[in-house]
Curated annotation (Swiss-Prot):
GO molecular function, one term: tRNA binding
InterPro entries: Ribosomal_uL16 (IPR047873), Ribosomal_uL16_bact-type (IPR000114), Ribosomal_uL16_CS (IPR020798), Ribosomal_uL16_dom (IPR016180), Ribosomal_uL16_sf (IPR036920)
Region Disordered, residue ranges: 1-23
Transmembrane segments: none
Any one GO BP annotation for this protein: translation
Subunit annotation: Part of the 50S ribosomal subunit.
Name of the protein in question: Large ribosomal subunit protein uL16
Protein source organism: Staphylococcus haemolyticus (strain JCSC1435)
One GO location term (cellular component): cytosolic large ribosomal subunit
Keywords, ordered alphabetically: Ribonucleoprotein, Ribosomal protein, RNA-binding, rRNA-binding, tRNA-binding
Length: 144
């Protein structure tokens, strides 16, 4: 499971979940990607579950990049505890995902295999997603 090695502060305020993603909106490493179309928190367990689903379907062929990381801690107080007495203990780690963010990238497999692997991964996540291909910058190449 993914979690930071060390953090400056153990507990944080809850992050904003409005607007579109500022960065990470393009497929940069692989050939195909899984792009979020809605906003949600994704836990480190959900990321790991999606990764396992993809790699098992691809039978360890190709390469998978995880483009999100759960930096943000979320806290929870125990059941049946009255309000007050400080903030609760850290329950887990989340990545805030906004529309437009690329979650996973895949390379080294055919488009059909990549599409199905990313579809299986999307079923493990709490966001709506779409399959995207890499867009080359600059348009045509000048080879004469």
């Amino acid at each position: 499971m993914l979690l930071p090695k060390r953090v400056k502060y153990r507990r944080q305020h809850r992050p904003k979940t409005t607007g579109r993603s500022k960065g990470g909106n393009y497929v940069t490493f692989g050939e195909y990607g899984l792009q979020a179309t809605t906003t949600s928190w994704i836990t480190s367990r959900q990321i790991e579950s999606a990764r396992i689903a993809m790699t098992r379907y691809m039978k360890r062929g190709g390469k998978v990049w995880i483009k999100i990381f759960p930096h943000t801690p979320y806290t929870k107080k125990p059941l049946e505890v009255r309000m007050g007495a400080g903030k609760g203990a850290v329950e887990g780690w989340i990545a805030v995902v906004k529309p437009g963010r690329i979650l996973f990238e895949v390379a080294g497999v055919s488009e059909e295999v990549a599409r199905e692997a990313l579809r299986l991964a999307s079923h493990k996540l709490p966001v709506k997603t779409k399959f995207v291909k890499r867009e080359e910058l600059g348009g045509e190449t000048n080879e004469s």
